[in-house]
Amino acid sequence: EMCIRDRPDSEDETFEGIDLLDPTKLVPEELAEVVLVGKLTLDRNPTDYFAETEQVAFHTGHLVPGIEITNDPLMQARMFSYLDTQLTRLGGPNFAQLPINCPHAAVNDNLRDGMHQTAIHQGMAPYKPNTVDDDQPELATEAEGAYVHLPREVSGPKVRANPVSFDDHFSQATLFWRSMSQVEQAHIVEAYTFELSKLFEKPIRERVLGVLANVDAELCARVAAGLGLPAPEGDPARGVVPSPALSQVTTEVGPVAGRVVGVVAGPGADLAGIGRLRKAVEAKGAVLHVVAQVGGELTKGRAKETVERTFLATRSIEYDAVVVAAGTVANDPRLVVLLQEVFRHCKALGAWGDGAAVLEAAGIDTSAPGVVLGDSVAKPFTADLLTALGRHRAWDRAV
C-alpha cells in the first residue's frame, strides 16, 4: 500500500513543535496519520542484474510537477550528491537514456554527445538563446507539462549554525526506545552489548553508557550489566509519550504469499502428507521446498517428491518456517543445526506424526509458541501452521 502523511505548510516549517527541517527528528504517526493514496505493485523481478540493477540511477531530483523539495539541508545536499554519484558511476549525464532509467516520454534535453548518447540530434545549437537555429529548441511551458518551481519568499540572515532543535539529542531516542515491544527492546540491548563487547578500550565503553543513560535508565542498566560495568546516572527526557506505530512487532496475522516453507523429509517420509501440505501452502501463494539429506527424488508407493534443498547446501535463512514430515529420522547434525537456528530465530516450526521426535531430538521445546504439531496433515494442522507463518515470528518465544 502507498501512503502519505500530509502536514500544513507553516512559515516556521514546524509541526506540533517539531522542526520539520531537522532530519534527526520524526513526527509520530499518532500526530500525523498515514493516509492511503494507492497501491504500488511489483509485478516482476529483474531478468538482467547488470542492465536493470547495476545501472539503475536513483535521484532525489526526479520529481513530477506538483512535488518540490523542502529546505531540509540534508535533502539539499542529497540533491547534489545523487546527481554527482550517477555522473561518476554511469560515465556522464546521459544516464537517463539507459533503458532502466529511460522515462516513458522520450528524453528531450540539450545534452549532446558523450557516453550513452543514443540520439542523433538535428540542428547546430545545443544551447539557448541562439540565432543559428532560430532560438530553438524552445523550453516546454507549464501547459505542456513542464516542471515549474513555485515562487517562495525568503528572508532572514544566513548563518553557519543549526536551529535550536538540533541541540536536543535524546528525546527522540527516548521516544523510540519506549515505543518498542519487549522483544524489540531485548534486541536493542543485545545489539549494544554485542557491539560494545568488541571495544577493548574501557573508557569508550563507559562514554557510550553515559550517552545511553540520557536515553533511558533501564536501557543503560541492561547494557551495563551485559558489559559488567556500573550504570552511570543520566538525565533522560521527561514527558515522552510512546508511539506504538514505531514498533514492528504485531500480533495480527498477515498474508503468507511469497513466504517459503521447508519440509524436512527422509527416505521413509510421509510423501502423501507432504503433497497435501504443498497444496495447502501453495493455495495461499507460499512456496514449499522439500529438504533432505541428499538430492534427487523421494518415492513411496505412487507418491513422489523432488528434493529442492539438501542439508549440506541450505541454512535457516532461506525459510520462514520449517516442518518435519512423519517418517523422518534425525541422524544428521546439520539437520539439528537447521532446526535449532529456526527455533532460535523465532520462526514457525512444525511436525506431524513421529516427526515431532526429530524436533525433540534437536532439543526443541515442542510446547513453545509457534511450534505446531499434528497427527497428520489435516486441515487443523495446516491452518495452525499458516497462522503461525502469517504472524511472521513467534516473538513470545524470545521474551
What is the predicted function of each stretch?
Residues M2-I4:
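Short, small-residue-biased leader/transition segments that mark boundaries at the very start
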Residues D6-G254:
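Charged, compositionally biased interaction regions
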Residues N45, D354-G355:
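Short, loop-centered acidic/histidine patches that primarily coordinate divalent metals
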Residues P163, Q182, A186, E190-R344, ...:
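Extended, subdomain-level signal for the structured scaffold at the beginning of enzyme domains
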Residues H345-W352:
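ADP-ribose/adenylate-binding Rossmann-like module
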